[in-house]
Amino acid sequence: MKTRLRALYCDHLSIMRGKYLPHSKIGDDSTRFCRSTFGVHYDRDLLDAPGAMMKQGLPDMELKWQHDDIRDSWHASTQIVLGDLYDDAGEKLSLCPRGTLKRAVAAWEEKGLHPKVGIELEAFALQADDNGRLVPYDAPGGVVYGTGPAADPLRFNDRIWAMADEMGFSLDMITAEFDSPQFEYTLTFDNAVKAVDDIVLFRLMAREIALEYGIVLTFMPKPVAEAGGSGMHINLSFTDEAGGNALSSGPRGGPDHMNDLARGCLAGLIHHHKGLAGLIAPTANSYMRLQPGSLSGYWQNWGGDHRNVTTRISSEGGAKARLEHRMADAASNPYTSVAAVLHAARLGVEHNHVLPPIETGDGFDRTDAKHGTAINLAGAIDDLERDTALTEAVGSELCANHIYMKRKEVRKTRDLEGDALRDFYVHFI
């Protein structure tokens, strides 16, 4: 058949929605969707969420893309593209997560700085047992930093690597994580929008390839109760107009070599810690991961080469100087999460927020930090709503939609536990 086009966007639930379109759509073009998908929940409940226009006729929105953004796909005779959403009057849709990230990038570019992002994804591999129940993938020889067939007997990760290479994704690493069968996937630093475009497509590709092996590869934050959690670590830096790394003060990194920009970004991330959680750890399951002593970004703190703090300062300097924010999970929309982190960092710089002292505790038995994220989704959404500086920066309409949908989610999940709670999310994240 003629090559077709798969046109996609990543929605408020971090679900990839799209259409297969004919060969004639390969070029600068567009297609329409129902705007009220922004009021659809995981269980397909239709909700009158702010901006979704569920009770105003369920009007169209338009996905627009450029020819240069079209790329090859991992499926035969198919190309793939991501685009931006517009309302039926042709205006940029305020609910569009990709547009939200572009606005966050533009706010930094007004300062002469260009955000660079590298994202680390973690995921668990599940498979059906003889009764059809999802259980952890059988990899008894898996160990932290494991490679080869002991960690992945079916070798589905080899196929993911090969296809990622063929598709032009710049993989830095695939490895087994601490809790078998958990894996980490890291893509190379790039300009913020390009980096997130790559991560949402890579995540989709990895899940679809794994399904061919009978594996449900889930990026949800805590699918296995007795194991650790899965995060989406956001590494960021900034390129200045001369092409240098604006976070760098020289060849050495770490807390003793931070410049004013790094301190300001850190202060903003600390200041907006509780509000950020509602956007970047956005499910009931997220708060099974966000716990003290779990290396997950719970505490309102920062440190150097320290995995039990929320924002970690790389010991590498020069071109590799960066901040690593460790709170987010991949149940969040990556565009929205990166936008929120960039805005929180920017607000710290602009408002001269005070940076508290570095964390000196080990994070297990002792922690200096006195405050963490909320203990559940309901509390995190309340914290987000209170952080009006953050919600206005990210986008008031997008955040209003998010808050409404997540409060509905609190009610939908409050009586679920164990497999029932996992299965509310697992096939979508």
Predicted regions and their residues:
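ATP/Mg2+-dependent ligation/transfer catalytic cores
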Residues: M1-M173, A195, G372-I429
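Helix-rich catalytic cores of soluble enzyme domains
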Residues: F124-V224, G228-T239
